[in-house]
Design a protein with these regions (language model features):
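Metal-dependent amide/peptide-bond hydrolase catalytic core
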Residues: 53-171
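Acidic/histidine-rich catalytic neighborhood of metal-dependent amide-processing enzymes
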Residues: 1-51
Length: 171
């Protein structure tokens, strides 16, 4: 018998379904081949994966009067710039003798969406990003730095114009 699973890259939904079906049929496995690009090396460690969506809520308005609104896309871009700065710091924090390639914690932006038209101040924006830590401390470091940046710089700046502005991070 051969069995194959699906959805490895996102939620691994196929593996639990396969396990349930094998149990129901009382089929015991004797071999497992994992289709990862390892060149047949045994892998005994894996980077972590933290996935985030950060939501920015500002104040819409007409594009001809930007001072009367809070542009969520502009604040999201400042947030992304901070993440990119942190990415550079992470490269310098690589542990000695790291077995990973690259040998340091990685951070990347997977998507950004916001606004409804060129002439409308965007009151909403969301940023999807991920962190692949080599060590737990890097995850703690990035979250502390970005949360502090939001709390002490971005949000107060937004709330000067519109007190109901908010920035919310989903994990």
């Amino acid at each position: 018998h051969f069995s194959f699973t699906f959805d490895e890259e996102t939620a691994c939904q196929g593996a639990p379904l396969l396990i349930d079906e094998l149990k129901k049929r009382n089929i015991k496995d004797s071999l497992c081949i994992v289709g990862e690009p390892t060149n047949m090396k045994i892998i005994d460690a894996h980077k972590g994966c933290y996935e985030y969506t950060t939501h920015f809520h500002g104040l819409a308005g007409h594009g001809s009067q930007p001072e009367k609104g809070v542009n969520a896309v502009e604040y999201a871009s400042k947030f992304i710039q901070k993440l990119m700065q942190l990415r550079e710091v992470l490269k310098k924090r690589k542990p000695k003798n790291s077995v990973f390639n690259p040998p340091y914690t990685t951070l990347q932006i997977g998507g950004i969406s916001g606004g409804i038209a060129r002439n409308v101040i965007a009151d909403r924006c969301k940023v999807d990003w991920e962190l692949r830590p080599v060590v737990k401390e890097d995850g703690i470091f990035v979250n502390k730095e970005i949360d502090e940046f939001v709390k002490k710089e971005l949000l107060p700046e937004m709330q000067k114009v519109y007190p109901k502005s908010e920035i919310r991070k989903e994990v």
